[in-house]
């Protein structure tokens, strides 16, 4: 289908940060705007030099090597670490789309590069806009067959968390497996969900500072899922219509729905990326 990405993204509000912006400021900006990713641009020419995403924050909070900024450089002093410039944890190898790209190229990029959004740039690599999986799904909702069900699109290999798991352990699981969200399960039943966006909400608000007394990051990374998980989870079931689930994602601004049976036992998960496979 020949639709330019700019037709979808032309009126999108674009929020950026600079390489010198502090991690704390970037977190606050992401939280205030409810964005999961921010392009990092040079102040002088608006050229894209990086991107910071919710998964970079998960990595920073114990999920991977970016945690070294806290643990080693600042000896676990969280308050010092979040005042470092965002260039310390941003992704420099940015997957972008050119302004003349079509929607099929965007879908292929999301599916093959495992990214949920991409800055749109001109030939000089200057930022023009940004397009996400949700933008594409919203634009193509009417193209989904009313009778198509989700069963062939469900991701069946689901990794879960438990209510007693600590934030740092869940962060490691997310980064290791490249998953942005984990259903939280107790005695085989779904009781909540934790997402990479939740990390932004926690750290970009007053929660982290209210939760700390010494400034040591362990006061945050040792928090259990039962304290921070989202309990009111929107779910799907096998046999649900794909279009209905896509509409729920767009309307409720969520990236995935756990698929459960009548006893709330996990059967899989369906994500925005899974929905995009319909158009591939």
UniProtKB/Swiss-Prot annotation:
Q: Where is the CBS domain?
A: 10-67, 90-146, 154-209, 229-280
Provide the alphabetized UniProt keywords: CBS domain, Repeat
Report the SMART domains cross-referenced here: CBS
InterPro entries linked to this entry: CBS_dom, CBS_dom_sf, Diverse_CBS-Domain
| Pfam families, alphabetized | CBS
Q: What are the boundaries of the signal sequence?
A: none
Question: Could you tell me what this protein is called?
Answer: Uncharacterized protein MJ1225
Species of origin: Methanocaldococcus jannaschii (strain ATCC 43067 / DSM 2661 / JAL-1 / JCM 10045 / NBRC 100440) (Methanococcus jannaschii)
């Amino acid at each position: 289908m020949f639709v330019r990405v700019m037709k979808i993204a032309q009126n999108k509000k674009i929020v950026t940060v600079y390489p010198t912006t502090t991690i704390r400021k970037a977190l606050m900006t992401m939280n205030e705007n409810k964005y999961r990713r921010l392009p990092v641009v040079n102040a002088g020419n608006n050229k894209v030099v990086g991107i910071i995403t919710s998964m970079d924050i998960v990595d920073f909070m114990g999920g991977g090597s970016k945690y070294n900024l806290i643990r080693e450089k600042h000896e676990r002093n969280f308050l010092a670490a979040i005042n470092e410039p965002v260039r310390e944890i941003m992704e420099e190898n940015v997957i972008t789309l050119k302004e003349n790209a079509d929607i099929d190229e965007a879908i292929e990029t999301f599916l093959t590069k495992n990214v949920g959004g991409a800055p749109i740039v001109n030939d000089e690599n200057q930022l023009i806009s940004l397009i996400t999986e949700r933008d594409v799904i919203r634009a193509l909702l009417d193209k989904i067959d009313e009778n198509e069900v989700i069963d062939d699109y469900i991701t069946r290999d689901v990794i879960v968390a438990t209510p007693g798991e600590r934030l740092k352990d869940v962060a490691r699981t997310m980064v290791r497996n490249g998953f942005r969200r984990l259903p939280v399960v107790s005695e085989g039943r779904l009781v909540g969900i934790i997402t990479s966006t939740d990390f932004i909400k926690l750290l970009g608000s007053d929660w982290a500072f209210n939760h700390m007394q010494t400034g040591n990051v362990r006061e945050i990374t040792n928090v259990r899922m039962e304290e921070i998980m989202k309990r009111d989870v929107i779910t799907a079931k096998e046999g649900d219509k794909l279009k209905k689930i896509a509409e729920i994602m767009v309307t409720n601004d969520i990236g995935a729905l756990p698929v459960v049976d009548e006893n709330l036992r996990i059967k899989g998960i369906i994500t925005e990326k899974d929905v995009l496979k319909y158009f591939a």
